[in-house]
Amino acid sequence: MKVLVVVALLVTLISYSSSEGIDDLEADELLSLMANEQTRKECIPKHHECTSNKHGCCRGHLFKYKCQCTTVVTQSGEETEGCFCGTPPHHKAAELVVGFGKKIFG
């Protein structure tokens, strides 16, 4: 059990460090991102529809939300695709481990 917790914590830390791409940007890239601040403010919040913009989801506490799509069948039998911004299961598990670690280690 301890090994599983340690492995999960390591995976979480690696995933978190790889998702923090802004920290690794050079100064020029950071300035261009700051110029596009308006675009970043218009990201799609969690649980909102992202069918037309699948890469526009906002960031959560640790990770960026992902656009998750499902096929919806209407009463008339038509199949349509419905997408929403949400947290993938493996990110939920990582956030749970990090939260648990923060409670234990302060």
Curated annotation (Swiss-Prot):
It comes from the Eukaryota. Residues 20-40 form a propeptide. Expressed by the venom gland. GO terms for molecular function: toxin activity. Pfam families: Toxin_35 (PF10530). It is found in: Secreted. Residues 1-19 form the signal peptide. Keywords: Disulfide bond, Knottin, Secreted, Signal, Toxin. One of its GO terms (cellular component) is extracellular region. InterPro entries: Spider_toxin_CSTX_knottin (IPR019553), Spider_toxin_CSTX_Knottin_CS (IPR011142). Disulfide bonds join C43-C58, C50-C67, C57-C85, C69-C83. The keyword Nucleotide-binding does not apply. Belongs to the neurotoxin 19 (CSTX) family. 03 subfamily. The presence of a 'disulfide through disulfide knot' structurally defines this protein as a knottin. This is U1-lycotoxin-Ls1z. It comes from Lycosa singoriensis.
